[in-house]
Amino acid sequence: MCIRDRAKPVAVLGHSQGVLAVHMTRAIEAAGSIEAAGKTLDEILAVAALIGAAGTRRVRELGLNPKYGEASPMLSVKGATREQVEALVKRVNNARGPISIAVTNSDNHHVLSGYPEDLAALALEAEREHKHQAKLREQKLHGGTVFNPTLEYLEVTLPFHSPLMAEAVEQTVSWAGACGFDQDRTRALAEEVLLNHVDWNARVKALFNAADPAKLWIVDLGPGNTLGKLIGNVVQGTGIGVVEATTLSERSTLSTLESE
């Protein structure tokens, strides 16, 4: 995702694994061209493969089944504050492992990582809380909006951005060293993808201070239109424009407009 003030990009943001593209963009900028950055780009792509392999290996070591009924290792919770999500996490008894807030997409949209069975237990707690508040509302003992978040399991096989993946980071760095790759860059990439919490909400809002929001345009490069929707929710009402460039057709149209 490229953020532009007129013709000059002021920032490049990547959501979750999109950080790989951010590092590739920086490498191209530092080298002066795609051709000059070729070796670094190849290494980043190779590290991406190592990250995936290390994550898969760690999941097997943990005995983490990527499916538990409908549950997966990551659960989107939309329509709940961080405090409400943390309260639900505390209600899960006898969890197999940590349930962590992996991604903060907005003030009321969070994604959790953990064992699928633990996330399924949290989903049950959310349903119990909804029914409890609905009953209180029906009895006129509770005012305001009834707690009713939208829950959706992500189609993933790893609990990304989770402390469960700490050993996978070390494994990735070890393999990268054996391959002769830059271990510092490898660690940074692996931690961003596997371990660190992603505060997308804060990253996007930081742009508001980078330039006049009314002059900023965000170009969504995909893949798909999910990211455009996520960022649209954060920048709504700020004056920042969002342009979709997720397909060849959309990019071709933008190139034509720019040349005109």
Regions found by a protein language model. Give the residues of each.
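Short helix immediately C-terminal to the catalytic nucleophile in hydrolase catalytic domains
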Residues: 21-22, 26, 228
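Acyltransferase/transacylase module recognition
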Residues: 4-9, 159, 163-260
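Glycine-rich beta-strand-to-loop/alpha-helix junction loops that act as flexible
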Residues: 15-17, 115, 221-223
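Alpha/beta catalytic cores of group-transfer enzymes, especially the acyltransferase/condensing modules
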Residues: 25-188, 192-193
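A generic hydrophobic-helix recognition signal that picks specific residues
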Residues: 8-11, 154
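Gly/Ala-rich beta-loop-alpha elbow adjacent to hydrolase catalytic centers
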Residues: 10-18, 22
